[in-house]
Amino acid sequence: MSTNFNELPVVVIGAGPVGLATAAHLRERGLTPLVLEAGATIGAAIEQWGHTRLFSPWQYDIDSAARRLLEPTGWTEPDPDALPTGHELIKHYLAPLAKLLGDDVIRTGARVVAVSREGIDKTRSAGREQTPFLVRVQAADGAVTDVRARSVIDASGTWGQPNPLGRSGLPAPGENAAID
């Protein structure tokens, strides 16, 4: 494991369209991405509504950096005017992009449970900007590990994390008691 701050990976939380596009942009810039996906597969949230057709055609669904990475591989870009389903988005875009990025970049079944700065707490903050992040990850089998990162990008999305009904991002009185 590298001890040089600039050689540490940039952790991306979530392997959906935004997370994988972020990894493509990082790779283009010569940075090392590490994508951590809580689900068992890339695009796990999309799988839950995969039968649904998107409102936006392919021309708006494919990120430019991802396209630049995919084009030299012989990947066939879908019809830019067609409206894909969630399953088609995964099959024709996310899966090829994930395969290109590789298993060393994407870890599925890896839920981020906490993010902190290494050696920093409420009383120690000197040198914070050059201190690695510490990302605590829980694997599907329950094992917990810490990953050092130069930065962290949250692309986990909102699926399964609904906005509370109350004001200011807080649950309405009684809302938590009514949750199934």
Predicted regions and their residues:
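Conserved Rossmann-like nucleotide-cofactor binding loop
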Residues: 18, 41, 159
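Feature captures the FAD/FMN-dependent oxidoreductase FAD-binding
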Residues: 76-161
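A short, basic/flexible loop-to-alpha-helix module at the beginning of a structural domain
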Residues: 1-8, 180
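Glycine-rich FAD pyrophosphate-binding loop
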Residues: 27-49
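Glycine-rich active-site loop/strand segments that organize a redox cofactor
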Residues: 41-92
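Short glycine-/acidic-enriched loop or helix-start segments at secondary-structure transitions
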Residues: 22, 45, 117, 163-165
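Glycine-rich dinucleotide-binding loop and its adjacent helix/turn
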Residues: 156-180
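N-terminal Rossmann-like FAD-binding beta1-loop-alpha1 element of flavoenzymes
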Residues: 8-35
